Amino acid sequence: MPARHDILCGAWDFLWKPWGSIELWESNIAHAMKMKGIATGIISDHPHLFETGGENYHTDFGMWDYVRGHEGDPWRLRDDPSWAGTPALPAAEGWFRHAYDTSRTWFRDETDYPGPRTMSATADWLDRNAGHHDRFFLFVDEFDPHEPFDTPEPWAYRYHDQRDEDLLIWPPYMKDAI
């Protein structure tokens, strides 16, 4: 989040400003461009841009497209009833179960994952808007690589000699976790 703040606000706050929102008193490039008649947009699957504590990242853009389903985004409330165990098992039930573990039961192939959907939405935006604006600024924020490290086939094992049956997508950031 601090890096995004610096990019959009033209600030050098990365090392000093904590993780958080664009403050109401701060100017940002999306607003300045919009005021000059430049078409602006943001396409992102980054859930923290759209949640409490990360607010105001999208509000000054002329349009925004939030690609749902990554990390802690509560995109789905229940597992897909037809889920057959692919792409991988969700985490066990309990307080530590992530919203992503529910969302991912709805993924069937590469095109269902947030990263590829973000890039597809970007290509669609460019196709739809080509030739319609003299100038535009499109900010594309792809959350990966970031936990969960959940890579769809055929990419997951492209550079491995053998399949790792204990594929961990949520690194155990605690002592004696494995």
Language model segments and positions:
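Catalytic domains that recognize anionic headgroups
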Residues: 1-178
